[in-house]
UniProtKB/Swiss-Prot annotation:
Keywords from the named record: Protein biosynthesis, Transferase
GO cellular component: cytosol
The protein's name in its UniProt record: Methionyl-tRNA formyltransferase
Function description: Attaches a formyl group to the free amino group of methionyl-tRNA(fMet). The formyl group appears to play a dual role in the initiator identity of N-formylmethionyl-tRNA by promoting its recognition by IF2 and preventing the misappropriation of this tRNA by the elongation apparatus.
Catalysed conversion reaction: L-methionyl-tRNA(fMet) + (6R)-10-formyltetrahydrofolate = N-formyl-L-methionyl-tRNA(fMet) + (6S)-5,6,7,8-tetrahydrofolate + H(+)
Organism: Streptococcus suis (strain 05ZYH33)
SUPFAM superfamilies on file: FMT C-terminal domain-like, Formyltransferase
GO terms assigned for molecular function: methionyl-tRNA formyltransferase activity
Length: 312
């Protein structure tokens, strides 16, 4: 039985970990995940999804703030693991740790060399890609730069957002890893180097990137909104305050950019640089997320055709 150290943090990683545990060919010696964090307005301390799985299976859990130079890393190196599997861990692995095992592989949610970095699923949606995928790759010191062992992809559906694609690709990654790992460990798969000329990056979304520019086309804004939902959530401004938009669809119509061109009890359509957007789920400042109908019957009851969105 192959002895592994597993490293990961979000639900994507938890799906991969459950797959390894159910497979029966792997002995998970330890699980490494990010420290518990305070989340939400009430700052409730919350463990990571990977930690929840680890505790469910009574696995040893390590949560170093920084792995490099930590006591936890020394302990991990002394476990006698054959290899390391990572999936959206969130930290760089020191070369010293990588060199202490026979192999180290990463489950990365993109079709490398496209979208190295921490937000590949977001960028696949924001850029309007037709497909998204997962690559199993060897771990090296440079971020997501290792040789590629295997990859698989799925079509991006019109209804997908970051949350749905995250869940789908977690299953793709789990299955691909379980199919790939035995042959890789046996030496029957030869990894392929990434083409440096095709490398692109997907750094974590910055706050200024969350703002909707109504001069863009309706299609671009549609992709931005779904490419940031359920996190970090795209926003515009209404009456000078932040106005989050969780869901919208393309609509017919033209008009002055950012202005309301149609309004009913259940519909609010805003003109863009090309075409229009019909808002479906929104969150005004200081309010919970709500349907556009609830907004128009409440805080937005006075909105009229010609009103402007986007001005701070």
């Amino acid at each position: 039985m192959t002895k592994l150290i597993f490293m990961g943090t979000p639900a994507f990683s938890a799906t991969v970990l459950r797959g390894l545990l159910a497979d029966g060919n792997y002995n998970i010696l330890a699980v490494v995940t990010q420290p518990d964090r305070a989340v939400g307005r009430k700052k409730v301390i919350q463990m990571t999804p990977v930690k929840e799985v680890a505790l469910e299976y009574n696995l040893p859990v390590y949560q170093p703030e920084k792995l490099s130079g930590s006591q936890e890393m020394d302990e991990l190196m002394n476990l006698g693991a054959d290899g390391i599997v990572t999936a959206a861990f969130g930290q760089f692995l020191p070369t010293k740790l990588l060199n202490s095992v026979d192999f180290a592989v990463n489950v990365h949610a993109s079709l490398l060399p496209k979208y190295r970095g921490g937000a590949p699923i977001h960028y696949a949606l924001i850029n309007g890609d037709e497909r998204a995928g997962v690559t199993i790759m060897e771990m090296v010191k440079e971020m997501d730069a290792g040789d590629m062992i295997s990859s698989d992809s799925i079509a991006i559906e019109e209804s997908d957002n970051v949350g749905t694609l995250f869940e789908k690709l977690a299953v793709v990654g789990r299955d691909l890893l379980l199919q790939t790992l035995p042959a890789y460990i046996a030496g029957d798969l030869k990894p392929v180097a990434q083409n440096p000329e095709q490398v692109t990056f997907s750094p974590n979304i910055q706050p200024e990137e969350e703002v909707l520019d109504w001069n863009k086309t309706a299609r671009q804004l549609f992709n931005q909104i779904r490419g940031m939902y359920p996190w970090p959530v795209a926003h515009t401004y209404w009456q000078g305050e932040r106005f989050k938009i969780q869901e919208a669809v393309e609509a017919e119509g033209e008009g002055s950019v950012g202005r309301v061109i149609a309004r009913s009890k259940k519909e609010l359509i805003i003109a863009t640089g090309q075409g229009a957007l019909s808002l479906k789920t929104v969150q005004p400042a200081g309010k919970p997320k709500m349907t556009i109908a609830d907004f128009l019957n409440g805080a937005g009851r006075d909105i009229a055709v010609g009103d402007q969105f986007g001005d701070q």
